[in-house]
Each structure stands twice: as structure tokens, then as C-alpha cells.
Amino acid sequence: MTSTPLSNSLPPTQHATWRDYLALTKPKVISLLLWTTVTAMFMAARGWPGDTFWSGLWLLIVVSVAGYMSAGSAGVFNMIIDRDIDLKMTRTAGRPTSSGLISSRNAAIFGTTLQVLSFVMLWVWGTPLAAWMSLAGFVFYVVIYTQWLKRTTWHNIVIGGAAGCFPPLVGWAAVTGDLNLFAGYLFAIIFFWTPVHFWALALMIKEEYREVGIPMLPVVHGDHMTVAQIGLYAIYTVVLSLMPVYFGAVSWIYFVSGALLGAWLLWLSYKLYRHVASGQPAERKVAVPLYLYSMLYLALLFLAGAIDRAVLS
């Protein structure tokens, strides 16, 4: 890892505030992760995740706070490792680590503290399995994705994206103390959804990735293969998302919601593919709708699952 050049560092008189440390945790990214965690808790409990209102509320607070700290810790270490390339990308140049506002040492102390507190909270007030699932997600994101795959292969998102699949397992394990087939489906849905979401983003900022040498799919194999892969993974996502209905884990509320949400995901993926197949470049304006909708798709799909299992349990 290279250090930040002196010319890009902030004046020594400028001190980091709590907002700068909050920015290290990537709060905007974490919001969707926490949503899948919380909705998974309702799915696992088939309703309110507690024997009483207060016990359920306490568990929701513990898992949400601990989940934020664990995911935030992963974001901190991601910024430490990637500070050299973050400085060269417009989207990330202002991050506290790449700008020199927060040193790598202080960031590492902050990130480690968050992770330790998260693990202890989940172990004591959740379940040991929830604590281990949270730690596994952290290790996968920081070590497997950021440290190993991100700079070496265009499969980085396919494999490394599994880190984002752990939050629903954390929520499920916090409620039940174990994992079952339906929890595995939640993991798999996010696994196949991730390339759709992040390759749409990669199309939008591919030139920045190219400049810093990150082998994202559109950089390595071009727009046409990227949109084809997006379409393929969109199909996988929609088909897999509807399979729990067949096994009786959910019923018509989830099925209708999943089918409608999935149909629009497939349509936007097809529109993007058709645009590129016609010989036009995958410009930002044609990738943005899919990128934004993919987040809404996942959020509403998990909400539908929580409502279905609560109402029709």
C-alpha cells in the first residue's frame, strides 16, 4: 500500500471530527445491508422477533447497532487498503483516509474497536452464531474481496460480493440461533443480485476503474459482455428469489411481489443490453436506472418476505 502524497494531504492544523469518522463507515452503503438484516429477523421470527415487545425491540436495537459497527469496520479497513487508488478516483478522492485527514493508524484503531464491540454485543445479547456470521462477513469483505480479489480479477464482484450476503444470516441467527434452507436462499438471492447492481455501477465509472488499474468486467471485457452478464445474473436472481414459494417457505404475498419486482428488474436489464447491442456505448444515463432500481428491488423483496411470513405464518 502506498502512502498519500504530501501535496494531497490536508493542512496539519485541520483535525478530524466525528463526522469524518462516521464517513469512514460508509453509512449510505450500510443502510441496505442493515435493511436485509432487520427484515431477515422478522422473516426468521415469522413476525415480531421477540417473546415480548420489549425483548424484541432490544434484540432489534442490538443487532442493528452491532451490524452497523461490523459493516462500518469493514468499510474502514477497505478505505485504509484502498487509500492509494481512492485518491485517484473522483468518486472517492475526498475520503478521510485518502485525503490524509485521518491516518491509517487511527483509522485501524477505530475499525478494530468497532469490530470487537460488534462481536461482543452479538455474542452477549444476540447469539454466538450471529457474532460469527458477522465476523465472517467482515473477513470476507476485507481480506477476500478488498485485499485479494479486487485488484486481481474481474470476478472480484462475483466472489467477493458474497460479503454482502452475510447480513441476513446475522439477523436470522440472532433470532433463531441457527440457520436453515430459507436463510440460505436469502444469502443466495443477494449473491446473484450483487453483480447486477455493481456491474451497473462499474459501467457508470469504468474509466475511473481503468485509470487506477482495477480489473472490473467492463474494463477487461467491454460493455457488451458486461450487459450480457448483467442480464444473466438478473435471470438467476429472479428465478432463485421465487423458489422459496415452491418449498412452502412463503406464499402469495411474496410471490406476487417478487414476480412484479423481478419483471421490472429483467426489463431494465434487457433495455441496457439492447442499448449496448445496438452499438451504442453504455453511458451513465442508461446504466443509472438499473443501478438505482436494483437497490429498491432488493429492499422491497425482503420487505415482502417479512410481511408474508408475518401475516400468513
From Swiss-Prot:
GO cellular component, one term: plasma membrane
Statement: the UniProt record of this protein carries the keyword Cell membrane: yes
Keywords: Cell membrane, Heme biosynthesis, Membrane, Transferase, Transmembrane, Transmembrane helix
Family annotation (CDD domains): PT_UbiA_Cox10
Documented EC number(s): 2.5.1.141
One GO BP annotation of this record: heme O biosynthetic process
Membrane topology, from the record: Multi-pass membrane protein
Enzyme class (EC, first level): transferase
UniProt-listed Pfam families: UbiA (PF01040)
Catalysed reaction equations from the record: heme b + (2E,6E)-farnesyl diphosphate + H2O = Fe(II)-heme o + diphosphate
Note: Carbon 2 of the heme B porphyrin ring is defined according to the Fischer nomenclature.
Protein role: Converts heme B (protoheme IX) to heme O by substitution of the vinyl group on carbon 2 of heme B porphyrin ring with a hydroxyethyl farnesyl side group.
Family: Belongs to the UbiA prenyltransferase family. Protoheme IX farnesyltransferase subfamily.
Record's protein name: Protoheme IX farnesyltransferase
Organism: Deinococcus radiodurans (strain ATCC 13939 / DSM 20539 / JCM 16871 / CCUG 27074 / LMG 4051 / NBRC 15346 / NCIMB 9279 / VKM B-1422 / R1)
